[in-house]
Amino acid sequence: MAAPVIIVGSHVWVEDPHLAWIDGEVTRIDGINVHVKTKKGKTVVTNVYFPKDTEAPSGGVDDMTKLSYLHEPGVLRNLETRYELNEIYTYTGNILIAVNPFQRLPHIYETDMMEQYKGIALGELSPHVFAIGDAAYRAMINEGKNNSILVSGESGAGKTETTKMLMRYLAFLGGRSGVEGRTVEQQVLESNPVLEAFGNAKTLRNNNSSRFGKFVEIQFDKNGRISGAAIRTYLLERSRVCQISDPERNYHCFYLLCAAPPEDIKKYKLENPHKFHYLNQSSCYKLDGVDDASEYLETRRAMDVVGISNEEQEAIFRVVAAILHLGNIDFGKGEEIDSSVIKDKDSRSHLNMAAELLMCNAQSLEDALIRRVMVTPEEIITRTLDPDNAIASRDTLAKTIYSHLFDWIVNKINTSIGQDPRSKSIIGVLDIYGFESFKCNSFEQFCINFTNEKLQQHFNQHVFKMEQEEYTKEEIAWSYIEFIDNQDVLELIEKKPGGIISLLDEACMFPKSTHETFSQKLFQTFKEHERFAKPKLSRTDFTISHYAGEVTYQSNHFIDKNKDYIVAEHQALFTASNCKFVAGLFHALHEDSSRSSKFSSIGSRFKQQLHSLMESLNGTEPHYIRCIKPNNVLKPGIFENFNVIHQLRCGGVLEAIRISCAGYPTRLAFYDFLDRFGLLAPEVLEGNYDDKVACQMILDKKSLTDYQIGKTKIFLRAGQMAELDARRAEVLGNAARVIQRQFRTCMARKNYRSIRNAAIVLQSFLRGEIARAVHKKLRIEAAALRVQKNFRRYVDRKSFVTTRSSTIVLQTGLRAMIARSEFRLRRQRKAAIVLQAHWRGRQAFSYYTRLQKAAIVTQCAWRCRLARRELRMLKMAARDTGALKDAKNKLEQRVEELSLRLHLEKRLRTDLEEAKVQEVAKLQEALHTMRLQLKETTAMVVKEQEAARVAIEEASSVNKEPVVVEDTEKIDSLSNEIDRLKGLLSSETHKADEAQHAYQSALVQNEELCKKLEEAGRKIDQLQDSVQRFQEKVFSLESENKVLRQQTLTISPTTRALALRPKTTIIQRTPEKDTFSNGETTQLQEPETEDRPQKSLNQKQQENQELLLKSISEDIGFSEGKPVAACLIYKCLIHWRSFEVERTSIFNRIIETIASAIEMQENSDVLCYWLSNSATLLMFLQRTLKAGATGSITTPRRRGMPSSLFGRVSQSFRGSPQSAGFPFMTGRAIGGGLDELRQVEAKYPALLFKQQLTAFLEKIYGMIRDKMKKEISPLLASCIQVPRTPRSGLVKGRSQNTQNNVVAPKPMIAHWQNIVTCLNGHLRTMRANYVPSLLISKVFGQIFSFINVQLFNSLLLRRECCSFSNGEYVKTGLAELEKWCHDATEEFVGSAWDELKHIRQAVGFLVIHQKPKKSLKEITTELCPVLSIQQLYRISTMYWDDKYGTHSVSTEVIATMRAEVSDVSKSAISNSFLLDDDSSIPFSLDDISKSMQNVEVAEVDPPPLIRQNSNFMFLLERSD
C-alpha cells in the first residue's frame, strides 16, 4: 500500500500504548518520519500513521465501506463513536458487526421493529440483526437458494442473544398466524432455553456462555413457511461437569434443579448447591438478576413445547441429580496395595442415592467405580483401582452420562420438530465459538481455533467474491487481489497422514504414549513448517501461527481428552438398569460402538463433523454477523480499544478490510465526490456537465492515475483519497487566508470609520452648545416682552368684563319675569284640554266593553257546539280502536313521571340554592365581624394617640418649667411614662396594620370563595346535565339490548325462519280510510273472508318492497344535498310501520342490497355514496327509534302543551285546521325536520337493523380510509428523503436560490404535490357525495396520523434522513400539507394538521440552528414537547448536517438523554421509539347524529320509478 500523501497541518492517526490509536496534527515532516502533536499535547515522531477524515460525521457511519479512509483506526473510531450512542450494529459491506451493549435494549427488538424491517432491502434502514435475517429470507424466497447466517465472536460477545433474535425474526417471517397447538417455529424457538439449560454455563467472560457449537437448519416450504428444522451440535465441553474454576459455574441445569420446588427436591434427594462436590469447587452459586427457581419452571415449560414428555423429563432430571450424587462419592485406601474402598458413610449414602436414581444395583455401581476386569487367553483377572484412579473413573462416568444425555436431548428435539423431506430451501444459523487464546490453551482451544481457521477461509473467499461482484457490477477493470490464504495452517492441523490430528490419533492408539512423546513427534515432523514453532522454555508446548495471531498450546491433556471410549464395566452396569431411559442411552452407545471396530477419537470425529458443516455452508449463500465484546468487565459504556482490535482481527474483519484495501478501498458516489472535491475545480460546478464527466475532469486536472470510474461510483486506490484531501486542504487553507485578509481589512476600515464618526459627533456637540446659549438669551428677551404685553391686556380685559356682567344681570331679570307670566297661561289651557279628553275616553270604553261581552258569549256557544260534535266523533273512534284510551293512560303516566322528575329537580335546585345562601351568609357574617374588630381597633388606636399627644404636651410644658434638684425623680418617671406610651402607640399602630392586612386578605379570600362557589355551581349544573344525558343514553341502550335479548331467546328456529319470509305482513295505512290494517293482529273483516284480502295485501306489500330495493340498488343520487336513497328507505319504513312489527324481512333485504353494492368495491365514488346514505339513514334511526315493549308512536311534547287528552283536543281547535288531527296522519310527520321526527318504540328487527347498519357504516369508513392509505404509502417513500439533483451546475442553482430562496424548486416538492393531489381527489369525491363533514374530518385525521407515523418511523430508522437538508425538504412538504388544510377549511379537515405533531417537531429539531447551545429542558419543553426521550435521543444521535457542517446537541445533553433512556428502559412496559398506526373507528353514532344538520325529508323527490307507482303516493306529500 502506498504511503498516504500528507502535508503540515494534516490530521492523522498514530499508535498509542494506552489507546491503541490516537489522533493528532502533523507539525513537521522529515522524510518518512512525521512529527505529530496528539490531542493530549504530546509530540510523537513515527513513520506509521494513517490519515484522519476530519469531515466524518460526528455520529459515525452505519456502513464502514462509506468511510473515506478504510483502515484500522478509522474502523475502531467509528465503532467506538456508534457504541457511545447505543448504536450497537454497524455494516461492513454486507457483514454485520454487533457490539454487545451489556444492557437490555428492548425497544430495538419489538414486533413493530420487525414490521419495519420486513421486506426492506439491506442497507436501506439502520443496521440491524433483523436486516440480515430479512436479507437471507428474501434471497431464499426470490432466488430459491439455501442461505446461512454465521454468527461468531468470543465468549461474552453476544452470540447466543444474537442467534435467538435471528431465530425469532425468521419465525416471525415464516410463522403461521392463528395456528393452535405446537407449531414448528414455536418448537424451534423454545429449543433455545432447553439447550441453554444443559449446554450453557457461567465463565470468566460471560454469565451465559455456550459451551458447545450449534448449527440450526430451518426448513421452509414453497410458500416460505417454516416446515421443519434440525439442530446439530459440536464439541460439548465435557470436562466442565467434573471440574470448574472459581468464579465460574457448572452447567445451568444443576443449579436449576437445586432450586426446584420442594417436592422435586425431595424426589431427587437434593440439597443446597454448596453441598455437592461438582458445584462447590467455585464460590459462585447464583447469577445476578437470574431466579433459578423460575428458570427451572420455564425450562420445564420449554421442554413441554419441544415435545419432551413428563416421563422423559423426570428421567432426565433423575440422571442430572444422579451425576451430582456421583460427584460426592469419595474413596479411601483399601487393605490391599493399590486398592480403594468407599471412604465413609456419607459417600456410601450418595452411592446408594445415585444407584436409586439411575435404577441400578448399588453394589454393581461400586464395583464399576473401583474394579476393572482384564480378559486374557488364560483367565479373567479382576483388579482394584487405587483412590486416584477410582476418582478418575467416577469423573469419566459422570462426563460420559452427561454428554450422552445432552446428545439424547438434541436428538429428541430434532425428532419432535421433524424434518420436512419436501422442503424447498433452508436457512442455517451457525452459533459457534470464536477464536480463543488464553494463558493456558488445551485441546478444547485447539479444536475451537481449528474451526475458526476453517470458517475464516470460507469468510475470506466470500469477501473476495463480494469484492469481485462489486467491481463487475460497476464495470471497472480489476486484477487479481492477493489475500493471505490459511490453507497451510489447515493442512498442518488436518492433513492425513502427517497432520497434528493424525499424529494425535496415532499416539492415542499406543498405550505407552505420553504427552511428551507426542510433543517430540510434533517437533520432529513440523520443525521446518512456517506456521509451527517450539517455545524455548518448554518441552511439551507447541505454537501455531493462526490468522489471528500465534497461540501456544499445552499438550499435557491432549491424549486423554482425545480418547473416546467407554469402560466396559460402566456399559454393562447401565445396560442392565431398570430405567429404560438410562438403558436406552447406553444401549444406543453399545450399538454404535459395535458397528465399527476402527479406532475413533474426539479429534477425528470433530474433523468429520466440521467437514460436513463446511460442505453444508458451501452449498448456501452466507451472511456474516461478527459479535464484539467491548470490555472484559461486562459493563455498559466501556470501550476497550485493544480488546476490540483483537476481536476484529480474530473475527476476520481486519482481514476483510485488508482485502478491500488491496483493491479500491475508497468508493464514493459521484454526488458525494463532487460535494467534497468540487472546489478543486470550480469551473466544473459552474458548467452543465454530467456528474461522471465532472468527476473525470477533476481527477484529470489533479493528474491522478490510480482510480477507476464505474457506473455510479469512483474507486480510488489506497493513498489517493489522502492526496485529494491534501490538495483540498491546501485550497481551503488559501481560501481561509483570503477570508482572513478580507476580514482584517474590514475590521480596520470599521475602526477608522468609528473614530471619524466619534470626532464628528464631538464637534457637532460643541457647536450645538454654543448655538443653544445664544438661543437661550434671545428667548429670555422675547419672554420679557410677552409678559409685559399680557399684563396690560389682563388689566383692560378685567374692567370690560365687570361692566358686561352687570348689564347681563339686569337683562336676565326682566326676561324671566315676562316668561313666568306666559308659562302660567299655558298651564291653565292644557289642564282644560286634559279634562275634556278623559271624559270622552270613558264614554267610548264603556260602549266597547258591552260589545265585547256580547261577542264572547256568542263565540262560546258556537265553540261548545263544535266541541260536542267532535267529542261524539272521538268517542265513536275510541269504541272502534281503543287506541285513544291507551294513549291517554300512557300519556298520563308520562305526565306523572315528568311531574315527579320535575319536582325532584326543583327540590335539588332548592337545596343547592339554600346551601349557597347559607354559605354566603356565613361569609358575610365573618366579614361583618372582621369589620367590627377593625373599627374597635381603629378607635383604640385613636384614643391611644390622643392620650399620647396629651402626655407629650404635658411633658413639654413640664420641661419648660424651671427644674430643681428635688424634682429629678418626677422627671425620670415622666420620661419613662412617655417612652411607655410611645411603645404602646407603635404596638397599636402595628396591630392596626396587621388588622388592615388581615381585612384585605379576608376580602381576597371572600372573592375567591365566591368565584369557587359560582364555578362549583356551574360544574354541578353541567354534571347534572351530563348525568341526565348519560342516564337517558344508558336507559336507551339497556332497553334496546333487553329487547334484543328477549327476542333472541323467545324466537324459536321455526319462527326465525318464518321471520325471513317475504310474505310477512307489514302494517300499512290505507289511503281510503284513516284506519290501520295488520293481517296478523286486527280483524276488521269477517272470519270467512279474511284470507283472500290478506293474501292480496301481502302480495302487494311484496311488490312494493321489490320496487324499493330495485330503486336503491342503483345510484339515484342526491336531491338538494340530501341522499335520496336514505330518505326513501326511511320514509317507506315509517309509512309501512316496519319498525313496530315483530317479524319482517325488509331489513335483511336492505342490508343485503348495501352489502352487494360495496362488496369488493374499489371505486371511491361508490363507497362515498353509500357512506353518505348509511350515515343519513343511521341519523334518522338514532333520532327516531327507541326500545320499548309496545309499538305505539309518540310525538315529542312541546313546551306548554296541556297534559290531559281533552286539553290537547281543545287546543287543537284553537290551532290551524290542518293540525287538528293526529300528527302521524299527515305528511308533516315525515316532511318535518329532525326536531319534528317522532319517536317509535322499535321491535327486535328494527333494533337489529340499526346495529347491522352501524357495522356497515364502520366497514365502509374503514374501506375508504384503507384505500387512501394504500394510495399514499408509495408516495410517502419518496417524501421522507430529499431527491438528489445533479451536483454539477449546483453553483448556478445556488445563485438562483439566493435570489428567491422562499419558493422551493418544483421537482423538490413534486412528490408532496402528488399527495396533495390525492387528498384533493378524495375530498372532492366525498363532498360530491355529501358525506357528513364529521366523517370527512375523521378520515383525514387518521390519514394525517398515518402520514405522521410513516414519516416519523422512517426518519428514526434511516440515518440519511436525519440531516439538515432533509429536514428542510420535509418541512417544505409539510408546508404544502398545511396549505392544503387551510384551503380545505376546518369543517372538512378538523384537527388533521395536529396529527402531524411528531414529524413537525422532529423536523423542527433538524432545521433549528445552534443545537449545541440548547439545553435538554428547552428541547423537551419548547422544541419537542410531544417526543419521548427515546425518540429525542435517537434523532440527536443520528443527526448530521450536510449543509453547514454544524453539530448535534452537546455531549452533556446526549449523556443526560442516555441516562434517562436507560432509566426508562428499566421501568417502561414498551420502550419502542416507533409510533403505532391507529386503525380504530374514531366516532360514535351519537357523534354523527349531533353533527348532522336538519334534513327536510319531505322535500326529497323520489326517483321516476317510484313516483309513477300509485302505492308510493305518500312520498309526494309535502309539508307546509
Swiss-Prot record:
Q: Which GO terms describe its biological process?
A: actin filament organization; actin filament-based movement; cell division; fruit development; Golgi localization; gynoecium development; leaf pavement cell development; mitochondrion localization
In this chain the Myosin motor domain maps to 59-729
The entry's ATP-binding residues are 153-160, 206-214
Q: Where is this region: Disordered?
A: 1062-1100
Any one GO MF term held by the record is: actin binding
Q: Which residues form a coiled coil?
A: 881-1047
After gene disruption, what is the outcome? No visible phenotype.
> Which parts of the sequence belong to the IQ domain?
732-761, 755-784, 780-809, 803-832, 828-857, 851-880
Which Pfam families does the protein's record reference? DIL, IQ, Myosin_head, Myosin_N
Q: Where, per UniProt, does this protein localize? A: Cytoplasm
Q: Does the keyword Coiled coil apply?
A: yes
Instruction: Cite the Dilute domain residue spans from the record.
Output: 1148-1463
Q: Which residues form the Myosin N-terminal SH3-like domain?
A: 7-56
**Alphabetically ordered keywords of this record:** Actin-binding, ATP-binding, Calmodulin-binding, Coiled coil, Cytoplasm, Motor protein, Myosin, Nucleotide-binding, Repeat
Any one GO CC term of this protein is: myosin complex
* Chain positions covered by the region annotation Actin-binding: 492-526, 528-551, 586-610, 610-632
The residue ranges flagged as biased composition, category Polar residues, are 1076-1086
Report the sequence similarity comment from the record. Answer: Belongs to the TRAFAC class myosin-kinesin ATPase superfamily. Myosin family. Plant myosin class XI subfamily.
Q: What is known of its domains?
A: IQ domain mediates interaction with calmodulin.
| The protein's role, per its UniProt record | Myosin heavy chain that is required for the cell cycle-regulated transport of various organelles and proteins for their segregation. Functions by binding with its tail domain to receptor proteins on organelles and exerting force with its N-terminal motor domain against actin filaments, thereby transporting its cargo along polarized actin cables. Contributes to the trafficking of Golgi stacks, mitochondria and peroxisomes. Required for development of pavement cells, trichomes, and stigmatic papillae.
Oligomeric state and interaction partners are given as: Homodimer. Interacts with MYOB1 and MYOB2. Interacts with PHOX1.
Name of the protein in question = Myosin-5
Record the organism: Arabidopsis thaliana (Mouse-ear cress)
Which gene underlies this protein? XI-1
